[in-house]
Amino acid sequence: MDRNNPTTSRLISILTFGSLFPILFFRITDPQGTIFWFYSVLMTGFIILTYVMTKGYVPKPDVGYRPEVSVIIPAKDEEEAIEETLARVFRADYPVSKLEVIAVDDGSTDRTWDRLQKVRNRLGVGDRLTLIRNAGNKGKRAAMAIGVRKARGEILVCIDSDSFVDRDAIKLLVQPFTDPTVVGVCGHGAAANTDEGVLPKLQHYWYQVMFRIFKGMESRFASVTCCSGLLSAYRRNMVLAVLDDWLNQTFMGRPMLIGDDRELTNLVLKGTEGKFVRSSSDGRLIPVLPLSARDAKVVYQSNAVAYTIVPTKLPEFLRQQLRWKRSHIHGCINASKFMWRKPLPAAASFYLYQFLVYMSTIVSVIWLVVRPLQGDALSGLVFLAGNMYVAFLSGLNVWKLSKAPKEAIPYTVGFVFISVFLSLTVLIYGWLTPWKGGWITRTAQGTNPWEETLSHPTPLIRANLSGESNPTP
């Protein structure tokens, strides 16, 4: 099957739009399944909208734009990956005179700091690499803020300490900033360790769906709701303007220690009307370009690629997913307060998607737990079959749009079972414990070193744009 053949495109379209007919048939043959039917119609409509919109997505090509860039890399216990992360950045196809790198060791307990010093000497980059070491672990958000305050570039590029960028990723990532209303850009993510088992490969193709399909759709509306930490970029002045708000976010009266990337995206996507930054030279407050929530744009660049190390063991994967589910809850609540100001297509797709995410858990419980316990096991099989069909369509579209190999289709279908399991377990637990947080993916045996901080909150950090962070009085 040729992905570029018009017949292939028509076949995928027929399979996508044709998914409405089984739903209508189910409604006729099972009039009692109103909830399932209503949910299925909305979900199918959203999926069709997503495929139609993402099909027309095109990344911005390289037009020669080369602003001054500051790359910020917060690191916590990444001795195995940090050298390669930095080496990839310094091998980037970007003018040396316009690229600085700031790495912040956030209280690592392994040899991360030694590796940072080693790579600076090995690469011979001198003062192009600034190394900062926190005496103790303060969290990713605080580490990133330190880098933001030290940065001199017009554009901030944020990269996770276990992510590896393509040689042309940075130059392609900054191209959308030629539009002055673009405040943030999300790069494309993929798994770096697909050779380490089935679980990493499942995640790799799930990333392709979430990035190329869903972020591609959001980018058509210029409203990408989460710039992934593995590769993203922001205008520095925009981040400085919201830095205090970001550092001092709370949830249920506690400092927010998760969802750093999603919340930063929210703050710049909300617009910068009435925001100021303080001049480092004379201390004057300078107004930032006043963008309303309707005008501020966050987009996706599928051609700017970074590869990240994904979990290889199920317990590690589940801890990561729990952190992500909790951050999604926080981010959804905060984004819901302003997304209605966006153009109608962006607002409608956002609220519909959030409704479907939470509705999916309720529907999963009813059709996979309640109805089988009532003796109706067929309903559970029908529900799983529907999810597998949707995943099959996602795999087809990833194969066609991302030029992925054909194995993308079965792996995407296979991830359905993990997704359903997450809806029935991790997502529900995240709902019940949304106040908990921390980089629990990196914590041994599921413990959380932030628990003491959560139980006894320290004074919130107030950003001093011309110096170090100081506790609020």
State where each predicted segment sits.
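Short linear elements at protein peripheries
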Residues: S228, R236, I440-P473
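Alpha-helical transmembrane segments
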Residues: R10-L20
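N-terminal membrane topogenic signal
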Residues: M1-I12
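Membrane-embedded multi-pass helical conduit in multi-pass membrane proteins
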Residues: P22-G56, P61-G64, F350-G437
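Non-transmembrane catalytic domains and loops of membrane-associated enzymes and transporters
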Residues: V63-M339, R462, N470-T472
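Membrane-proximal soluble regions of multi-pass membrane proteins
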Residues: E316-R326, G331, Y411-E451
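Cytosolic juxtamembrane regulatory segments of multi-pass membrane proteins
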Residues: V71-I82, S419-W431, P449-G467
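Flexible internal linker/loop segments at domain or repeat junctions
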Residues: C332-Y353
